[in-house]
Amino acid sequence: MASLEDGTYRLRAVTTSNPDPGVGGEYATVEGARQPVKAEPSTPPFFERQIWQVTRNADGQYTIKYQGLNAPFEYGFSYDQLEQNAPVIAGDPKEYILQLVPSTTDVYIIRAPIQRVGVDVEVGVQGNNLVYKFFPVDGSGGDRPAWRFTRE
């Protein structure tokens, strides 16, 4: 499995069945510290709030930190609770597993490294919020949320 290089990226919401849906789309967008991370178009006023520093840690997991201007302190993808449809929060950066989607070079499933009996906890979109979704660990459960990582 290929690992993602450390760097700054924009994260576009896609799916495992349609990893390259064409122009447009929604991108992970910070609203502010301790606020839910949103999925917004890559246009003003959102564009400047869609840059993320992705760093691989020694254990092979990643942190996804907001890389925008004038951030008063470091925050990134985080959570208060890992329940079905709970929001991804811009908070103290947590670690995640990035799983490359087969037949792609830049599309990954973002999973929380939390053990839940029989399920994977993955980052998806509901409405215009990034949320945690549960999927069976056996790969069943249909189309999964994924993210295209585009270098800045």
Curated annotation (Swiss-Prot):
This is Clitocypin-4/-3. Pfam families: Inhibitor_I48. It comes from Clitocybe nebularis. It comes from the Eukaryota. The keyword Disulfide bond does not apply. The keyword Cytoplasm does not apply. Gene3D superfamilies: 2.80.10.50. One of its GO terms (molecular function) is cysteine-type endopeptidase inhibitor activity. The lineage of its organism: Eukaryota, Fungi, Dikarya, Basidiomycota, Agaricomycotina. InterPro entries: Prot_inh_I48_clitocypin (IPR019508). Binds and inhibits cysteine proteinases. Inhibits most strongly papain and cathepsin L, more weakly bromelain and cathepsin B while it is completely ineffective against cathepsin H.
